[in-house]
Amino acid sequence: TIGDMGANQFGNKCKPVESQRIPTSEEIQQQDWSAYKGKILRIDLDGSIPSDNPEVSGVRSHIFSYGHRNAQGLAFSKNGYLFSSEHGPKSDYEVNRIEAGMNYGWPHIAGRQDDQAYSYCNWSSHCKCDALKFSDYFCPKSIVTKPESDWYHPNFREPIQTFFTVNNGHNFRQHSCGHEFICWPTIATSSLAIYESETIANWSSSLLVSLKHGQLYRLKLDNSLSTVYETPE
C-alpha cells in the first residue's frame, strides 16, 4: 500500500491529494509510478504488472484499488477476499473489503458518504496556498469546501466498518486527554488479521484490529464476508 503521503495538510498543504489520479499508459510504459499514491498495489514477484490486474480508466498498472488515504493492515481470507484497515483524518477510520478496480473515495469521502463531520477542504487548490496558515480544524472561507454528497463515482465502495462515525459539530479539540488527537473518536486502525478457526466459540469469520489505547476490536462478518453484522467488541 502507498498512502497519500500527507498531502493537503500541515507542511504539505499545497501538495494535491493524488489518491484519485490514475496513471496514463505513457507513464506506465516509462515506468513512472508517481500516480501510485493513495493506492493498494498488486505486483508480480519479479516486479511486473500482473496480466489479470484490473484496468482502471482504460489503463492496466500495478494498481489494484484506489481512493485510499492511508491503508495499513492487509489480510486475506481463506477464500481469497482481501480486507484492509485505513487511517482517516480525525474520525471515520475504515475497514474495507477490497475489490479489484474499485474506488474507496478519498479525499472526497471519509468513512461513509453521510455528510457527517467531514468535508473536502482542498488547500492545494488555492492560488495563494503558500500564504495560508494551515488548520486541521477549520477551512478558510477563500477555499471551496465540498460536502461528501457532492461527489459521485460509479465504482465507489463504502467501508464495511468505521471507527468511528460522529455527527456534525463534534468537538475534536478536547484537552482532557492531554493532547487533542488522543481524544479523537478513532482507534487508529493499523494491523489487521482475520480469524477463521473454530477454536474460540463464535469467533470464526471475524476481523481483528487494534492500535490506540491497547484495545483489540473484533468485527464479526456474515457468511459472505461482506458485512459486519454485530457491533464491534
PLM features: residue spans?
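Beta-propeller domain segments
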Residues: 2-232
